[in-house]
From Swiss-Prot:
UniProt source species: Narcissus tazetta (Cream narcissus)
Compartment(s) where it occurs, according to its Swiss-Prot or TrEMBL record: Secreted
One GO process term, biological-process aspect: regulation of defense response to virus
Domain Bulb-type lectin, chain residue ranges per copy: 1-109
Function of the molecule: Mannose-specific lectin. Displays antiviral activity and therefore may contribute to defense against infections. Shows agglutinating activity towards rabbit erythrocytes.
Subunit structure: Homotetramer; antiparallel.
Further details from the record: Has a significant inhibitory effect on SARS-CoV-2 in Vero E6 cells (IC(50)=0.8 ug/ml). Viral replication is fully inhibited at concentrations from 20 ug/ml to 5 ug/ml, and 50% inhibition occurs at about 0.4 ug/ml.
Protein name per UniProt: Mannose-specific lectin
High-level lineage: Eukaryota, Viridiplantae, Streptophyta, Embryophyta, Tracheophyta
Length: 139
């Protein structure tokens, strides 16, 4: 799956995946985006604790929490409560949608975007946004 929905978490070793790219919450509390086996982005929180988890909050903030539920990294995108999704896109970018509030900035131009689960993969940003808006309105 390439999407983390509001209220969902990634436990240590769990990840978003779209084939080539993996966005993983590692055992060492580092949240890392890999292109095949090469790390291309990270929260740089490795070694701060063990067995942290990632939470996509209903306020749009993506947060790494320690086992004691202390935040150790955040996307700083918190705002109004609503339905948000964190998407690992086909272009290698990880983006929080409600309105786009945060991204890793690692996209490769022209790669397209993966679709919402249960739908066919989409080839354009406009098509992806239609599906994201549908999710945000109906959830």
């Amino acid at each position: 799956d390439n999407i983390l929905y509001s209220g969902e978490t990634l436990s240590p070793g769990e990840f978003l995946n779209n084939g080539r790219y993996v966005f993983i919450m590692q055992e060492d509390c580092n949240l890392v985006l890999y292109d095949l086996d090469k790390p291309i982005w990270a929260t740089n929180t490795g070694g701060l604790d063990r067995r942290c988890h990632l939470s996509m909050q209903s306020d749009g903030n993506l947060v790494v929490y320690s086992p004691r539920n202390n935040p150790i990294w955040a996307s700083n995108t918190g705002g109004e409560n609503g339905n948000y999704v964190c998407v690992l896109q086909k272009d290698r970018n990880v983006v929080i949608y409600g309105t786009a509030r945060w991204a890793t900035g690692t996209n490769i131009h022209g790669a397209g975007i993966v679709g919402v689960p249960g739908s066919a993969p989409q080839n354009s940003t406009a098509e992806m946004m239609k599906l994201v808006r549908k999710y945000l309105i109906t959830k």
